[in-house]
Regions:
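Short, small-residue-biased leader/transition segments that mark boundaries at the very start
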Residues: 3-8
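Long, hydrophobic, well-ordered secondary-structure blocks that form the structural core
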Residues: 9-13
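Catalytic cores of carbohydrate-active enzymes
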Residues: 14-15, 117, 121-184
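Active-site-proximal structural scaffolding
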Residues: 17, 28-33, 45, 49, ...
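Carbohydrate-binding/catalytic loop surfaces
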Residues: 18-37, 73-101, 151-176
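Active-site-adjacent helix/loop patches that line small-molecule binding or acyl-intermediate pockets
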Residues: 33-37, 56-60, 136
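Well-ordered alpha-helical scaffold segments within catalytic/enzyme domains
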Residues: 35-45, 112-125
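Mature extracytoplasmic enzyme cores
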Residues: 40-106, 119
């Protein structure tokens, strides 16, 4: 019932998106894509799906400031160009180190791209469906076959070292996670 209210009566998620030009983002992804697509696929259709879809496309293709929940996806240009988000080169990162959380963002963006692609297909937008489906494999660029874990990479593509998959981080490589949690 609440899901229906957010799409129809309150229109809050789309209305909030119209204010800033992007669907609201949460944590590191823009899971409005899963919410809107899931609602549509469940038969909730009496909302302005086209407006919601256009905002989801902004999230997927337009660089946002990433400042707050109205800023769109951060690092989307880098994600689109190289297929993944690189991590900052930080010497001796600590648990609370603040960086790009690049592994987590890449994984979440790939998931959000999949959700938006499903909506594109439902709406007959085959061009964006194809583009987004290609990006759903982006997370694979951060799987290190030598360690068998999801792992951060630097801008030049080298793996971050040293690497301990048990070591958690607040926002370095992962968001409140470690290699084990991000892989399995």
């Amino acid at each position: 019932r609440r899901q229906r209210q957010m799409c129809i009566r309150d229109r809050s998620i789309t209305d909030r998106g119209k204010i800033g030009g992007f669907m609201p983002t949460f944590f590191h992804g823009d899971h409005a894509s899963t919410f809107v697509t899931g609602s549509y696929l469940r038969g909730i259709r009496d909302f302005d799906v086209q407006a919601a879809y256009e905002l989801l496309l902004n999230n997927a293709f337009v660089e946002g400031s990433g400042k707050g929940p109205m800023g769109g996806r951060r690092f989307i240009k880098e994600y689109m160009e190289q297929g993944w988000i690189s991590e900052d080169d930080i010497t001796n990162p600590k648990l609370e180190t603040v960086a790009k959380a690049a592994v987590t963002k890449t994984q979440e963006y790939a998931y959000d791209d999949y959700a938006t692609a499903l909506l594109a297909k439902e709406l007959g937008d085959s061009e964006n469906y194809e583009k987004l489906m290609k990006r759903t494999d982006s997370y694979k660029h951060l799987f290190d076959p030598s360690t068998q874990f999801m792992r951060g990479r630097l801008k030049d593509g080298t793996w971050i070292t040293p690497f301990d998959p048990k070591r958690p981080f607040y926002e370095y490589m992962y968001r409140e996670a470690n290699g084990w949690q991000s892989t399995f």
